[in-house]
């Protein structure tokens, strides 16, 4: 089919899309309607943690579809319970609520923190509802999660905002402490700010934050929608800092490409009462069966060590490129990395990469002066080398 034969005009406009219709994908590769192949270093913004059409996920999806798709979240089902058990067994959390998107999980985290703050009032007897978040953070596109986000301009798009989200500066503990009041209930952050430009919170800052929140009896909430599920080389990114948060959210990678997210908390924080939280598809057995396959593959012997090795390899290759072209360096954790371009050519490089022939390359520029890399966690060093070679060609032409 030609592009003109696809009724794309029926889709609501939300962003500028190129005239490409993807029809197949396997591993690190996508194929479009013309048969052109693309090396994918975006993977749906870190969603496809095991690459496109992973065999284990396909098997889990097919097997579950033949047994049970949707009995209603008012009842238990087998994959729901199994995945909750896997997550609690391999984290510091005791309770799990499943949802469909990272924004929904983060919305749930905000509700849970506010519920806990009502039950645990301040010394002055006030309900605690404010959650300190951070400049340049990204927590979703619902009204509350947009208000929680520190993305420039989002405070006016759908004004008035949901109140209660003062903004601190990442890796500046004094900026957090200065915002604490009798109405503060918690602090919420991404261990690595993805949309903000792949900005990692330092281990020292995470430890300071945990100490500060404990001192003031506040909740520490980690948004691991992008950084979690093996992306940073550990199962969860908070584990890099040897701390234990009170609440964590997961999305993207937990489903490996299917709509699945999770809100996790400790027993002490689990405050919801009947009717406080729910959702038509939460804990859906079709999605949680795939989630079980994803987590089991991430926990397979040597897998996370391999992520660390390939992350170090990608880092070294990006640093070499940076030095060769006089760029501003690189940063990140594991296989969530950024190349600092030093000038606003990110969008130009993304477009040129996609249009390369005979094979295209999919990259992402969260900021005009940054390229972000989110390959499948099982990407090979050969595929990294191929990407670096293509990027080298682009930098020669556009750098």
Curated annotation (Swiss-Prot):
First-listed, main subcellular location of the protein, grouped into a coarse class: cytoplasm
Source species, domain of life: Bacteria
Swiss-Prot/TrEMBL keywords: Amino-acid biosynthesis, Aminotransferase, Arginine biosynthesis, Cytoplasm, Pyridoxal phosphate, Transferase
EC number: 2.6.1.11
GO MF terms held by the record: identical protein binding; N2-acetyl-L-ornithine:2-oxoglutarate 5-aminotransferase activity; pyridoxal phosphate binding
Binding site for N(2)-acetyl-L-ornithine: 141
Catalyzed reaction equations: N(2)-acetyl-L-ornithine + 2-oxoglutarate = N-acetyl-L-glutamate 5-semialdehyde + L-glutamate
Subcellular location: Cytoplasm
Transmembrane domains' residue ranges: none
GO biological process: L-arginine biosynthetic process
Cofactor: pyridoxal 5'-phosphate
UniProt xrefs under InterPro entries: AcOrn/SuccOrn_fam, Aminotrans_3, Aminotrans_3_PPA_site, Class-III_PLP-dep_AT, PyrdxlP-dep_Trfase, PyrdxlP-dep_Trfase_major, PyrdxlP-dep_Trfase_small
Cofactor binding note of this UniProt entry: Binds 1 pyridoxal phosphate per subunit.
SUPFAM superfamilies from the UniProt entry: PLP-dependent transferases (SSF53383)
Residues modified as N6-(pyridoxal phosphate)lysine: 252
Keyword Protein biosynthesis: no
Binding residues for pyridoxal 5'-phosphate: 102-103, 138, 223-226, 280
Keyword Amino-acid biosynthesis: yes
GO annotations of cellular component type: cytoplasm
Pathway the protein takes part in: Amino-acid biosynthesis; L-arginine biosynthesis; N(2)-acetyl-L-ornithine from L-glutamate: step 4/4
Additional information: May also have succinyldiaminopimelate aminotransferase activity, thus carrying out the corresponding step in lysine biosynthesis.
Family stated for the protein in its record: Belongs to the class-III pyridoxal-phosphate-dependent aminotransferase family. ArgD subfamily.
Assembly and oligomerization: Homodimer.
Protein name (record): Acetylornithine aminotransferase
Biological source species: Ralstonia nicotianae (strain ATCC BAA-1114 / GMI1000)
Gene: argD
